[in-house]
Design a protein with these regions (language model features):
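Conserved beta-loop-beta/alpha segment of the NTase-like Rossmann-fold superfamily
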Residues: 60-61, 68-147
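Short beta->alpha linker loops
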Residues: 29, 55, 80-83, 214, ...
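N-terminal glycine-rich phosphate-binding loop and ensuing alpha1 helix
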Residues: 1-61
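Active-site glycine-centered loops adjacent to acidic/histidine catalytic or metal-binding residues
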Residues: 9, 105, 221
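A structural signal for short hydrophobic beta-strand segments in well-ordered beta-sheet cores
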Residues: 25, 144-146, 208
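Phosphate- and divalent-cation-binding pockets in alpha/beta enzyme and binding domains
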Residues: 13, 36, 59-62, 86-90, ...
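Catalytic-core segments of class I nucleotidyltransferases/pyrophosphorylases
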Residues: 121, 151-236
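Residues at the starts of beta-strands that form the adenosine-phosphate
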Residues: 2, 47-50, 73, 98, ...
């Protein structure tokens, strides 16, 4: 399986807390969080790992180059984009088959992710398999609406959950090159990853199906970082 890591953000909340390194380099267990994620992806059978890395982060670019020189299948794509969807589009450009995309701060159980990789590989070509979770810790989660037939039919950013259930995006996206091509082919221009997910579910013929994780969250501040180390310690 190919993986795409989005590492374009500086991490404004970490900056406010006094961190001097860019967000992907914030440590988990004394290692950059993006390195911890890459180790997990290797454990889950990575064929190729594409990293959309902010071109203004030399510390990150140097670190990724070190990993590549050590033989890891990392392809660095230096980017400067307007929003998170544009980062996804640039980082995944040229991938024809299936891939799983995520941000550099994604935290999830490794065993469940292995099952997710298998499910994405086996999903029909016209189906996007999106990670969801009932573990809601984010201040402004992206709520998902799942129909009675089990299909994701809408998303809502912040506010109240849909009436059907409280379930949110896990920040894990099972996609393909052909699915990525549907959005621009319809003349749609998502303003963010959240907008991309909603447009994919509401405005395109792509079938969007859920894959549920017991726990999944992003690392946006020191509190999240400590939680991530606690959870990863248990899962490992």
């Amino acid at each position: 399986m190919d993986f795409v890591i989005l590492a374009g953000g500086l991490g404004s909340r970490f900056v406010k807390e006094g961190y001097e390194c860019p967000k992907p380099m914030v440590p988990l267990f004394w290692r950059p969080m993006i390195g911890v994620l890459i180790d997990t992806l290797m454990e889950c059978g990575a064929d190729r790992i594409y990293v959309g890395a902010n071109a203004r982060m030399p510390m990150l670019l140097d670190y990724l180059e070190e990993l590549r020189e050590k033989g890891l299948p990392v392809e660095v794509r230096p980017i400067i984009t307007d929003n998170s969807y544009c980062t996804l589009k640039a980082a995944s450009e040229g991938i024809e088959g299936k891939f799983i995309a995520m941000t550099c701060d994604a935290i999830f159980p490794t065993d469940e992710f292995k099952d997710y990789v298998k499910a994405v590989a086996e999903a029909p070509a016209d189906t996007a398999l999106m990670g969801l979770t009932r573990f809601v810790e984010d201040e402004s989660p992206l709520y998902a609406r799942v129909s009675e037939s089990g299909e994701v039919v809408d998303y809502r950013y912040g506010g109240e959950p849909f009436a059907e259930s409280t379930i949110v995006s896990a920040g894990l996206y099972g996609l393909s090159g052909s699915i990525m091509g549907v959005i621009p082919a319809l003349g749609l221009e998502p303003e963010s990853l959240s907008d991309f997910q909603r447009l994919l579910a509401v405005k395109t013929p792509v079938k969007v199906m859920p894959f549920e994780f017991t726990i999944a969250f992003d690392v946006d501040n020191t509190r999240d970082r400590l939680h991530a180390e606690e959870f990863l310690g248990k899962w490992k």
